[in-house]
Amino acid sequence: MFRETIENEYIVIQEGTSEGTQMKYRKGDYWYKKDCRGKEGLVEYLVSEMLKYSTLDLAEYVVYEYGYINEARGCRSKNFLEAGEELITFYRLYYNEFGKDLSQILALMETMEERIEYVIKFVWQSCGLDITEYLKKVFTLDMLILNEDRHLNNLAVVLRGNRFVSAPIFDNGMSLLTANQSVNWHFPVEENVKRVVARPFCGSHEKMFHYFGQGFCVDFAAVQQWIEEEEDTNEKKVLKYQLQRYSFLATESI
């Protein structure tokens, strides 16, 4: 766990479509985010630690540390961009090309399938990159962790020289019910998880998962051993429940 004092000169203002308003800093080779609506930093840490026991490569997701920023809870992650690389979100990619808000365009479409196919086609035509496998991994994770804030500014590509590649999966803090205001912790977890609404293509994580299929596996035994060592929190309780709920994502050994 880290403790960092950061002056206001390191505050970075980012525009986007996220409902979150976390204070973000860039200092040295690290990004820092303060908690805002829940224990987002803890969630980022738990999710990235869990993914270490998955079939995803380390380069396919961002690793977060949990700690304190100016004595407030939060997290930090290393900058994943190499020199000369640029992160371009789906939102900005579309706006740069058409001058329109992609989320508003998708809202006009009637079905999840239309929205997904439109975005995949657009990114292919703009970047020459098929993002199907990337989205498959993202929505497998989002279903598992109940991500309530996947949007067009945390789905992204990276411009690397003269070609585009999928960005690593990042920004998972609004998950594990940490900031869901409708949750009642006097109720069982299985009741509270019903209060989750997914994004961005439809309100159901499972529908998006079934559209794409399974994106990765998790070493269930290793995760269970690790998670028991973590501090008892509601977020940990939800993650344990979700791992049991979607135990078909497990693999015996990685």
Q: Model features per residue range: what roles?
A:
Residues 1, 129-131, 253-254:
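Intrinsic structural disorder
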Residues 1-102:
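Conserved ATP-binding subdomain of kinase catalytic cores across diverse folds
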Residues 35-39, 162-254:
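C-terminal catalytic region of ATP-dependent kinase domains
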Residues 38, 47-48, 59, 103-109, ...:
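A broadly tuned "polar low-complexity/structure-edge" signature
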Residues 61-64, 107-110, 197-203:
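Short C-terminal domain-edge/linker segments immediately following a structured domain
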Residues 80-139, 203, 215, 231, ...:
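ATP-dependent phospho-/nucleotidyl transfer catalytic cores
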Residues 112-176:
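Conserved kinase catalytic-core segment
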